[in-house]
Amino acid sequence: MTIRDTGGLMKRTLILFLMLLAMAFPALSQAAGEGGERILDYAVTARVEEDASLVVTERITVSIEHKAIIHGIYRIYPVKIRENGDVLRHYGFEVLSAKLDGKDTPYSVTEEGYTAGVAMGDPESKAPRGSHTYELTYRTTGHVRFLPARDEIYYNVTGNFWKFPIDHVSFTLELPGGASPEAVTAFTGALGAKGAEYRMTGPSSLETTGALSPGEGITVAFGWKKGIVTEPEKNLSDFMGDNRALTLSAIPLFQLLLFLL
Protein backbone atom coordinates (compact mmCIF):
# COMPACT_ATOMS: atom_id res chain seq x y z
CA MET A 1 0.00 0.00 0.00
CA THR A 2 1.45 3.40 -1.04
CA ILE A 3 1.03 6.39 1.25
CA ARG A 4 1.10 9.77 -0.58
CA ASP A 5 2.56 12.85 1.05
CA THR A 6 -0.42 15.12 0.36
CA GLY A 7 0.60 17.50 3.15
CA GLY A 8 3.85 18.41 1.40
CA LEU A 9 2.05 18.96 -1.89
CA MET A 10 -0.50 21.24 -0.26
CA LYS A 11 2.28 23.18 1.46
CA ARG A 12 4.15 23.72 -1.81
CA THR A 13 0.93 24.74 -3.54
CA LEU A 14 0.17 27.27 -0.80
CA ILE A 15 3.67 28.75 -1.01
CA LEU A 16 3.38 29.07 -4.79
CA PHE A 17 -0.01 30.78 -4.45
CA LEU A 18 1.35 33.28 -1.91
CA MET A 19 4.32 34.06 -4.15
CA LEU A 20 2.04 34.73 -7.12
CA LEU A 21 -0.20 36.92 -4.96
CA ALA A 22 2.79 38.92 -3.72
CA MET A 23 3.96 39.47 -7.29
CA ALA A 24 0.51 40.61 -8.41
CA PHE A 25 -0.21 42.94 -5.46
CA PRO A 26 2.01 45.88 -6.57
CA ALA A 27 0.46 45.83 -10.03
CA LEU A 28 -3.02 45.78 -8.55
CA SER A 29 -2.16 48.64 -6.21
CA GLN A 30 -0.72 50.71 -9.05
CA ALA A 31 -3.78 50.11 -11.22
CA ALA A 32 -6.03 51.21 -8.37
CA GLY A 33 -3.99 54.39 -7.90
CA GLU A 34 -4.02 55.23 -11.59
CA GLY A 35 -7.79 54.97 -11.63
CA GLY A 36 -8.23 57.72 -9.01
CA GLU A 37 -9.18 61.33 -9.52
CA ARG A 38 -6.61 63.15 -11.63
CA ILE A 39 -6.21 65.78 -14.32
CA LEU A 40 -6.12 63.92 -17.60
CA ASP A 41 -5.27 66.89 -19.81
CA TYR A 42 -4.43 70.54 -19.16
CA ALA A 43 -4.51 72.57 -22.40
CA VAL A 44 -3.68 76.28 -22.15
CA THR A 45 -3.74 79.01 -24.78
CA ALA A 46 -2.43 82.48 -23.89
CA ARG A 47 -3.03 85.41 -26.24
CA VAL A 48 -0.78 88.43 -25.73
CA GLU A 49 -2.70 91.65 -26.37
CA GLU A 50 -1.02 94.78 -27.73
CA ASP A 51 -1.50 96.45 -24.32
CA ALA A 52 0.65 93.68 -22.74
CA SER A 53 -2.26 91.94 -21.03
CA LEU A 54 -2.86 88.22 -21.50
CA VAL A 55 -6.16 86.52 -22.30
CA VAL A 56 -5.76 82.94 -21.14
CA THR A 57 -8.01 79.95 -21.73
CA GLU A 58 -7.43 76.79 -19.68
CA ARG A 59 -9.19 73.56 -20.67
CA ILE A 60 -8.85 71.18 -17.76
CA THR A 61 -10.10 67.63 -18.32
CA VAL A 62 -10.51 65.77 -15.04
CA SER A 63 -11.56 62.32 -13.89
CA ILE A 64 -14.32 62.76 -11.30
CA GLU A 65 -15.19 60.05 -8.77
CA HIS A 66 -16.79 62.17 -6.02
CA LYS A 67 -13.83 61.69 -3.69
CA ALA A 68 -12.03 65.04 -3.54
CA ILE A 69 -14.03 66.49 -6.46
CA ILE A 70 -17.65 66.82 -5.34
CA HIS A 71 -19.14 70.02 -6.78
CA GLY A 72 -16.33 71.08 -9.10
CA ILE A 73 -12.67 72.08 -9.17
CA TYR A 74 -10.71 74.87 -7.51
CA ARG A 75 -7.99 76.74 -9.45
CA ILE A 76 -5.53 78.72 -7.30
CA TYR A 77 -3.86 81.57 -9.17
CA PRO A 78 -0.91 83.61 -7.79
CA VAL A 79 -1.61 87.36 -7.89
CA LYS A 80 1.45 88.55 -5.95
CA ILE A 81 5.02 87.26 -5.74
CA ARG A 82 8.23 88.50 -4.16
CA GLU A 83 11.06 89.21 -6.58
CA ASN A 84 14.64 90.31 -5.97
CA GLY A 85 14.32 90.32 -2.23
CA ASP A 86 11.51 92.60 -1.08
CA VAL A 87 10.09 93.86 -4.39
CA LEU A 88 6.45 92.80 -4.69
CA ARG A 89 5.18 92.06 -8.20
CA HIS A 90 1.41 92.22 -8.68
CA TYR A 91 -0.56 90.38 -11.35
CA GLY A 92 -4.00 91.59 -12.35
CA PHE A 93 -6.60 88.83 -12.59
CA GLU A 94 -10.15 88.99 -14.00
CA VAL A 95 -12.28 85.95 -14.80
CA LEU A 96 -14.12 86.29 -18.11
CA SER A 97 -15.99 82.97 -18.21
CA ALA A 98 -16.18 79.46 -16.76
CA LYS A 99 -17.67 76.44 -18.52
CA LEU A 100 -18.24 72.75 -17.94
CA ASP A 101 -18.33 70.58 -21.07
CA GLY A 102 -18.93 73.66 -23.21
CA LYS A 103 -21.78 75.13 -21.13
CA ASP A 104 -21.60 78.03 -18.68
CA THR A 105 -21.07 76.90 -15.09
CA PRO A 106 -21.27 78.90 -11.84
CA TYR A 107 -18.01 80.19 -10.43
CA SER A 108 -16.80 82.33 -7.56
CA VAL A 109 -13.51 84.14 -6.94
CA THR A 110 -11.92 84.73 -3.55
CA GLU A 111 -8.63 86.56 -3.02
CA GLU A 112 -6.55 85.91 0.05
CA GLY A 113 -2.97 86.97 0.58
CA TYR A 114 -0.87 86.24 -2.46
CA THR A 115 -3.41 84.12 -4.36
CA ALA A 116 -6.87 84.22 -5.93
CA GLY A 117 -9.00 81.09 -5.88
CA VAL A 118 -11.58 80.27 -8.56
CA ALA A 119 -14.22 77.69 -7.61
CA MET A 120 -15.86 76.28 -10.75
CA GLY A 121 -19.06 74.27 -10.42
CA ASP A 122 -22.51 74.45 -8.88
CA PRO A 123 -22.25 74.37 -5.06
CA GLU A 124 -25.85 73.10 -4.89
CA SER A 125 -25.30 69.97 -6.98
CA LYS A 126 -22.67 67.31 -7.53
CA ALA A 127 -20.40 67.38 -10.55
CA PRO A 128 -21.05 64.55 -13.03
CA ARG A 129 -18.92 61.45 -12.61
CA GLY A 130 -16.41 60.42 -15.25
CA SER A 131 -14.21 62.46 -17.57
CA HIS A 132 -15.31 66.08 -17.97
CA THR A 133 -13.70 69.33 -19.13
CA TYR A 134 -13.74 72.63 -17.26
CA GLU A 135 -12.85 75.73 -19.27
CA LEU A 136 -11.65 78.89 -17.54
CA THR A 137 -10.96 82.11 -19.46
CA TYR A 138 -9.42 85.10 -17.74
CA ARG A 139 -7.47 88.29 -18.37
CA THR A 140 -4.25 88.88 -16.47
CA THR A 141 -1.65 91.65 -16.43
CA GLY A 142 1.93 92.07 -15.29
CA HIS A 143 3.42 88.98 -16.95
CA VAL A 144 5.16 90.66 -19.89
CA ARG A 145 8.70 91.77 -19.04
CA PHE A 146 10.29 94.50 -21.12
CA LEU A 147 14.01 93.76 -21.24
CA PRO A 148 16.75 95.77 -23.00
CA ALA A 149 17.26 93.23 -25.81
CA ARG A 150 13.78 91.73 -26.12
CA ASP A 151 10.40 91.34 -24.45
CA GLU A 152 9.18 88.13 -22.86
CA ILE A 153 6.63 86.44 -20.66
CA TYR A 154 7.61 84.29 -17.71
CA TYR A 155 4.44 82.39 -16.91
CA ASN A 156 3.47 79.59 -14.54
CA VAL A 157 1.06 77.69 -16.78
CA THR A 158 -0.60 75.33 -14.29
CA GLY A 159 0.33 76.76 -10.91
CA ASN A 160 1.78 74.50 -8.21
CA PHE A 161 -1.30 74.11 -6.03
CA TRP A 162 -3.06 71.12 -7.61
CA LYS A 163 -3.59 68.14 -5.30
CA PHE A 164 -4.01 65.78 -8.25
CA PRO A 165 -1.52 64.27 -10.71
CA ILE A 166 -1.54 65.92 -14.13
CA ASP A 167 -1.08 63.45 -16.98
CA HIS A 168 -0.44 65.93 -19.78
CA VAL A 169 -0.02 69.69 -20.25
CA SER A 170 0.08 71.65 -23.50
CA PHE A 171 0.69 75.38 -23.94
CA THR A 172 0.32 77.68 -26.94
CA LEU A 173 1.29 81.35 -27.10
CA GLU A 174 -0.38 83.75 -29.54
CA LEU A 175 1.43 87.04 -30.26
CA PRO A 176 -0.05 90.12 -31.98
CA GLY A 177 0.10 90.00 -35.77
CA GLY A 178 0.92 86.31 -35.81
CA ALA A 179 4.51 86.95 -34.72
CA SER A 180 6.65 84.04 -33.52
CA PRO A 181 8.88 83.97 -30.44
CA GLU A 182 12.67 84.04 -30.82
CA ALA A 183 13.53 82.17 -27.63
CA VAL A 184 11.62 79.53 -25.67
CA THR A 185 12.38 77.59 -22.51
CA ALA A 186 10.34 75.83 -19.84
CA PHE A 187 10.77 74.28 -16.41
CA THR A 188 8.82 71.36 -14.94
CA GLY A 189 8.49 70.08 -11.39
CA ALA A 190 7.96 71.58 -7.96
CA LEU A 191 8.14 75.34 -7.38
CA GLY A 192 11.67 76.48 -8.21
CA ALA A 193 12.66 73.19 -9.89
CA LYS A 194 14.48 73.19 -13.24
CA GLY A 195 13.10 70.00 -14.78
CA ALA A 196 12.95 69.77 -18.57
CA GLU A 197 10.27 67.17 -19.26
CA TYR A 198 8.77 68.95 -22.26
CA ARG A 199 9.13 69.17 -26.02
CA MET A 200 8.29 71.78 -28.63
CA THR A 201 5.30 70.98 -30.84
CA GLY A 202 5.55 74.16 -32.93
CA PRO A 203 7.26 77.57 -32.98
CA SER A 204 4.89 78.83 -30.27
CA SER A 205 3.69 75.65 -28.57
CA LEU A 206 4.98 72.88 -26.32
CA GLU A 207 3.80 69.94 -24.25
CA THR A 208 4.99 67.91 -21.28
CA THR A 209 6.61 64.52 -21.89
CA GLY A 210 5.86 63.08 -18.47
CA ALA A 211 3.16 63.23 -15.82
CA LEU A 212 3.31 65.87 -13.07
CA SER A 213 2.86 64.83 -9.45
CA PRO A 214 0.61 66.75 -7.02
CA GLY A 215 2.21 70.13 -6.29
CA GLU A 216 4.22 70.12 -9.53
CA GLY A 217 3.66 72.34 -12.56
CA ILE A 218 5.26 73.86 -15.63
CA THR A 219 6.55 77.40 -16.13
CA VAL A 220 7.37 78.82 -19.57
CA ALA A 221 9.48 81.71 -20.82
CA PHE A 222 8.82 83.01 -24.35
CA GLY A 223 10.89 85.88 -25.75
CA TRP A 224 10.23 87.99 -28.86
CA LYS A 225 11.65 91.06 -30.57
CA LYS A 226 10.80 94.45 -29.18
CA GLY A 227 8.02 96.56 -30.68
CA ILE A 228 5.39 93.84 -30.99
CA VAL A 229 3.79 94.71 -27.64
CA THR A 230 3.40 98.23 -26.23
CA GLU A 231 4.96 98.75 -22.83
CA PRO A 232 2.40 100.17 -20.37
CA GLU A 233 3.21 103.41 -18.57
CA LYS A 234 4.76 102.74 -15.21
CA ASN A 235 2.43 103.68 -12.37
CA LEU A 236 4.43 104.90 -9.37
CA SER A 237 1.40 104.84 -7.07
CA ASP A 238 0.87 101.14 -7.78
CA PHE A 239 4.51 100.36 -6.99
CA MET A 240 4.35 102.35 -3.74
CA GLY A 241 1.12 100.62 -2.74
CA ASP A 242 2.46 97.13 -3.38
CA ASN A 243 5.82 97.88 -1.80
CA ARG A 244 4.73 99.86 1.24
CA ALA A 245 7.62 98.64 3.38
CA LEU A 246 10.21 99.80 0.86
CA THR A 247 8.42 103.13 0.46
CA LEU A 248 8.33 103.80 4.19
CA SER A 249 11.98 102.84 4.61
CA ALA A 250 12.91 105.37 1.92
CA ILE A 251 11.20 108.30 3.68
CA PRO A 252 13.97 108.95 6.25
CA LEU A 253 16.57 108.96 3.44
CA PHE A 254 14.45 111.43 1.47
CA GLN A 255 14.14 113.65 4.55
CA LEU A 256 17.91 113.52 5.04
CA LEU A 257 18.50 114.60 1.44
CA LEU A 258 16.14 117.56 1.93
CA PHE A 259 18.00 118.51 5.11
CA LEU A 260 21.37 118.41 3.33
CA LEU A 261 20.03 120.57 0.52
Regions found by a protein language model. Give the residues of each.
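Bacterial N-terminal signal peptides
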Residues: L16-A24
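Positively charged n-region of N-terminal signal peptides that target proteins for export
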Residues: T2-T13
